[in-house]
Amino acid sequence: MAMDAVVNTRCGTLRGTEADGVRTFLGVPFAAPPTGANRLLPPQPVVPWTGVRDATDYGDSPPQVAPPVSAGFDWDTGLSGGDCLNLNVWTPSAGAAAGPGVGTAGLPVMVWIQGGAFEVGSTAAYDGRNFARDGVVCVVINWRVGADGFLFLDDGHANVGLLDQVAALEWVRDNIADFGGDPGNVTVFGESAGAMSIGVLLSIPRAEGLFRRAILQSGAAHHVLPALAAERIGRSLAEKLGVPQTREAIAAVPVKRLLTAQTELKTELLAHPDPEHWGHDVVASLMPWQPVIDGDVIPRRPIDRIAAGAGAHVDVIIGTNTEDWKLFLAITGVLARVTEEGLSGTDSIEGFPPPASYGLPVRAALEAYRAHYPGATPGDLLAAVQTDWWVRIPAIRLAEAHSNAARTTGAGTYMYEFAWAAPGLGAVHALEVPFVFDTLDTNARLFGPLLGENPPQELANAMHAAWVSFATTGDPGWPGYEPASRATMRFDVTQDVVNDPRSWERAQWEGIR
């Protein structure tokens, strides 16, 4: 039976629950509600409260569009609303009871930044209790998505969704000791857009010193928009709303109307992915809302700053799933409809960019892919190319840049590949998440439908333990990555280290991505 658990923070007292050796605090505010005068602006400090604040239910999720059919599963967003800048904390009962200074340095802390194409996401989809079970303080954060988080109009404000993440990490720095955590031993980890966000956080001055380690799952440091492309999206949104092209005018639009306009804009992008109209970076990624190189929050391309030494003191794990992008082609039905003509052509394939749009020498590259994937359908080949462009090659580039820069700091760089194939689907995007959280049973809230029957618990044991070990000591249990060997841990029913997996595939993208 759950009991009350109480903790005092800088802003006030929280009442959560305690059960099975874990204390849980839900819906904890880390910034003021981004409503009214604060809408579409950077996060503002929480106003302290008196008395005891209830922290037994999930807080609001950020306003967001309906998940696309390509999500492939029910997205549990909980209650979407304005008071959305909140987070959840799971901590071992002993550590939380002891408060600051547990042992000599407190418990390791892991902060999860969720994915969702910078359009959807909710803390209600993730359960961190098994990290707490294993001696880690786990935090899952909300942050603004879509236009609420990434509207850009070149008006002095940008990347407020990214600044939400920074504000949450500052809250962790200032308060996590009250939950038994060590603010000097924080690991950020995230998947997809969450991992892409971490790639940016590694590079920007405002996040420096807020985390010691980072894990990037199927996302790296390449998905950002140039200011010109992002401004074009922002002004197109204002035109669709019929309001002046100012932040104040868009902020005055009711939430539902703004979300409807975002859906219409995305539908137009998918139906007519013209680079001349939208910009190449938007069309190639199919994501109109992304972090923006504004010259302030993001001074320049994150991968370039990392290559120059930003984040070189941070230990990192970087990884991808073998068939990441196949998920989106399979569940939309496009996978079975791709033709050889479409694969070799220059036109969009039902909204998905063809290989030619990525700068590949199409004929030679497709010959190489066919040779190494005998029997692959045109859809399989498109999935392989898009997996490389979206996540695998950016992950390799990030590992190369970080490992080179970290030679002078001693920080570790580690690479993994998640290779377990779900029945009838493959080792697709997001499939690793319930293994990392060790929630293959009824707690696999978001990604459980992808797993099929009887997913291997031994794989969850291995991945979860590696993540906990890395957060605790900086060592996940396999050799570090360096360009000479490119050691990569391959996670399947059994695990083994492979040097430079699919080197031929990497070679196709030299000088391109």
Please describe what each predicted stretch is:
Residues A195-A207:
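Short glycine-enriched nucleophile-adjacent loop
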Residues P108, F179-E191:
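Alpha/beta-hydrolase fold nucleophile elbow
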Residues C84, H157-A177:
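Alpha/beta-hydrolase active-site loop
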Residues G190-A193, S218:
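Catalytic nucleophile serine of serine hydrolases
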Residues M1-N159, P183, S285, T322, ...:
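Non-catalytic accessory segments of hydrolases
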Residues D60-P63, E367, A384, R392-R513:
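Mobile gating loops/cap/lid regions near enzyme active sites that modulate substrate access
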